Amino acid sequence: MRKLVVGSRRSKLALTQSQQFIDKLKAVEPNLEIEIKEIVTKGDRIVDKQLSKVGGKGLFVKEIQHELFEKNIDMAIHSLKDVPSVIPEGLTLGCIPDRELPFDAYISKTHTPLSQLPEGSIIGTSSLRRGAQILSKYPNLEIKWIRGNIDTRLEKLQTEDYDAIILAAAGLRRMGWSDDIVTSYLDRDTLLPAIGQGALGIECRSDDEELLTLLSKVHNDEVAKCVTAERTFLAEMDGSCQVPIAGYATISDQKEIEFTGLIMTPDGKERFEYTMNGTDPVELGKKVSNKLKEQGAYEIIKRLNEQH
């Protein structure tokens, strides 16, 4: 096997999860020589604005995909939730490895449970999806935007006027933070995850047969089916970063995929949700999308997209 070059964002989390995946590859192919090339993306350069206001999807992957096309790197290790639902022609997701915990972590400054926060308490989040779902269940709380890496957000929780923050559990776990700092992990009924949350997507060139064969050794087919249902739903709903959209699939003991899709307004006042079971992930994602469109969810999406 030739020497491989992996493209990664420069953030601590991106580099850590890249190294963790490389270790997984080396466990099945010990003699691999792999180098990490750090790439700064547009999303990394914009630190003072809400991402949904500056183009959302693709902000963390376009520069990396360019490096793949130029053959400066052989593969890219993405957080799957950052990857747009349509992959450019000539590239492919060559592998979906094991999924980390897909839920969100709620961290309170005073360890107060979410359901017991006093009226007017301020919750920091970087996501419309989280904000909308929290306001839907707890309209007496206030959402305030927070940006930055995990360390920055934890510091802001202590030094600024946030009473709590919500962030992806997967990032905390991959960075080695212990469960002790988490007040609670929010289950799917409290906060449905983002599309692909907790999963990695390993992107490479579609014609790189040698690499695709290697990647197949660490591919998790069940996780791939789940995220395919989720990402199909995202593509069908034409979900952009202006739209609070969530979707989560699991596989039952009967080997059926159960998928829940959710569309909301940012203020949490309008909510469209549907759950369905099936065996074909693409068909399932499309069916749930069609159900939500029948309920009127697509009108919300069009309205929100037009506003931006």
Swiss-Prot record:
Q: Which UniProt keywords apply?
A: Porphyrin biosynthesis, Transferase
Record EC number:
2.5.1.61
Keyword check for Transferase, yes or no.
yes
An example Gene Ontology cellular component term from the record? cytoplasm
Q: Could you tell me the Gene Ontology terms of the biological process aspect for this record?
A: protoporphyrinogen IX biosynthetic process
**Gene Ontology MF terms:** hydroxymethylbilane synthase activity
How many and how are cofactors bound here?
Binds 1 dipyrromethane group covalently.
What cofactor does this protein call for? dipyrromethane
InterPro entries per UniProt: HemC, Porphobilin_deaminase_cofac_BS, Porphobilin_deaminase_N, Porphobilinogen_deaminase_C, Porphobilinogen_deaminase_C_sf
**Gene3D superfamilies of this UniProt entry?**
Periplasmic binding protein-like II, Porphobilinogen deaminase, C-terminal domain
Q: Which reaction does it catalyse?
A: 4 porphobilinogen + H2O = hydroxymethylbilane + 4 NH4(+)
Positions carrying S-(dipyrrolylmethanemethyl)cysteine are 241
- The reply on keyword Membrane is no
Pathway of action: Porphyrin-containing compound metabolism; protoporphyrin-IX biosynthesis; coproporphyrinogen-III from 5-aminolevulinate: step 2/4
A UniProt-annotated Pfam family? Porphobil_deam
Q: Relate the protein's function as given in its record.
A: Tetrapolymerization of the monopyrrole PBG into the hydroxymethylbilane pre-uroporphyrinogen in several discrete steps.
Please give the NCBIfam families that the UniProt record associates with this protein.
hemC
Family per similarity comment: Belongs to the HMBS family.
UniProt cross-references to HAMAP family, sorted A to Z: Porphobil_deam
Report quaternary structure and partners. Answer: Monomer.
Q: Which PANTHER family match?
A: PORPHOBILINOGEN DEAMINASE (PTHR11557:SF0)
Query: What extra comment accompanies this record?
Result: The porphobilinogen subunits are added to the dipyrromethane group.
What's the protein here called?
A: Porphobilinogen deaminase
Instruction: Please give the organism.
Output: Staphylococcus aureus (strain MRSA252)
